[in-house]
Design a protein with these regions (language model features):
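Short, structured segments at the rim of ligand-binding sites
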Residues: 1-371
């Protein structure tokens, strides 16, 4: 069994360069399927998910080289439109290939996705969007098959902003005939980057950065050359860690992606120095409790909820943490209690009573954020 041994009560100091964002690079990798040619993506993090997605692109026929964060993908040799179960089951983001395959080839065959176990993350928004664009959707032997002679622009509305569906519908609609309007679209930084990159490739997307996107379909795109934006979740994790015991500087970061996290840390009594592409956080001598509710961007990210719960367990007072995105995402709470935290759960809300002196113990990791 894999394990990490942590010797605690050590002050953190120094600087760290933030990696490229996994959540940004995966849809960019999918977008290489939209057109033939050699695509260049820099600052690609070397992670299991990026390696898995690269394997998927190669199974579809793409050729690639990956070296020290630089990825080259030649999508001129795509010879399959099927994303097999063995790969898709390990990573929900594999579903991103459906939009570009459908847009470029008029057909996609993708296994129902797998991924993290907590909370429902249906692909209904994706499929309903494809249908509005004119695709026929069939479920057959665990595979979703989408076909269309030519996608046509449509008005598409999401009841709840969906990052995955927004990205998928964008990639399908840039090659559709006519105009597509997407309302209540996700506005996360990686969606903004995807829009900008698609426009640089020759797409016509208006309203970038807002929750209403207008896409005028084009006949052909050019290959991309892009550097992935910094990972706001990695950066936020280091900021929260630095607030406990330390003085650390984050480099190659975009502070505008972390406005809500910076504000919450300042409310907790932390001193931060924010520059154009760096953030320094000093430990909080008297950490104050701060309530937090997760929300879609620009709200507090659900991917930083577990880290904030851990921080608040040593704050001087009680705080309430509510997760409105994934109501069951509290597997870390029983493990923090094993360390000495005083936390009680009520549905999707955690009541944390601090301060508690946490002590080392054996704990179990159930998912990446709980770790």
């Amino acid at each position: 069994m894999d394990k990490l041994v942590v010797n605690g009560a050590k002050e953190l100091s120094g600087s760290v360069e933030i990696s490229g964002a996994k959540n940004a690079v995966l849809p960019l990798m999918a977008a290489t399927l939209l057109t033939e040619g050699e695509h260049t993506i820099n600052r690609v993090p070397d992670l299991k998910d990026t390696r898995t997605f690269l394997n998927l692109l190669e199974m579809l026929g793409a050729k690639s080289t990956y070296n020290n964060g630089d990825l080259l993908v030649d999508s001129s040799t795509i010879n399959s439109v099927e994303a097999p179960y063995d790969l898709v089951k390990t990573m929900r983001a594999s579903f991103y290939v459906m939009g570009p395959l459908l847009g470029r080839f008029g057909e996609a065959r993708v296994s129902l996705p797998g991924g993290c176990a907590w909370g429902p993350r249906p692909v209904d928004y994706h499929l309903k969007g494809f249908e509005k664009l004119g695709a026929e959707i069939i479920l057959e032997k665990g595979y979703i098959i989408a076909r269309a002679k030519k996608l046509k622009g449509a008005q598409i509305h999401f009841d709840i902003p969906s990052v995955g569906a927004t990205a998928n519908i964008l990639m399908a609609s840039v090659l559709a005939e006519g105009k597509t309007q997407i309302t209540n679209a996700a506005i996360e930084p990686h969606i903004v980057q995807l829009c900008k990159v698609l426009n640089e490739m020759g797409a016509h997307i208006e309203g970038v950065g807002s929750n209403i996107l207008f896409v005028n379909g084009v006949e052909k795109l050019s290959p991309m050359k892009v550097e992935t934006i910094p990972d706001m979740i990695e950066a936020g994790t280091f900021l929260i860690a630095g607030a406990t015991l330390g003085n650390i500087t984050l480099k190659k970061v975009d502070p505008t992606h972390l406005n809500i996290v910076i504000r919450k840390l300042e409310q907790a009594g932390c001193e931060l120095v924010v520059n154009d592409n760096s953030i320094t956080v000093n430990k909080c001598d008297k950490l104050q409790p701060v309530d937090m509710t997760t929300d879609v961007h620009p709200g507090f990210p659900t991917d930083l909820q577990a880290q904030w719960v851990a921080l608040m367990s040593v704050a001087n007072g009680s705080s309430h943490i509510t997760d409105t995105i994934y109501h069951d995402r509290f597997a870390h709470v029983p493990e923090l209690i094993r360390l000495g935290a005083d936390i009680s759960l009520n549905k999707n809300m955690a009541l944390i009573r601090g301060p508690k002196k946490l002590k080392g113990a054996q704990v179990m990791s159930t998912d990446i954020r709980a770790s």
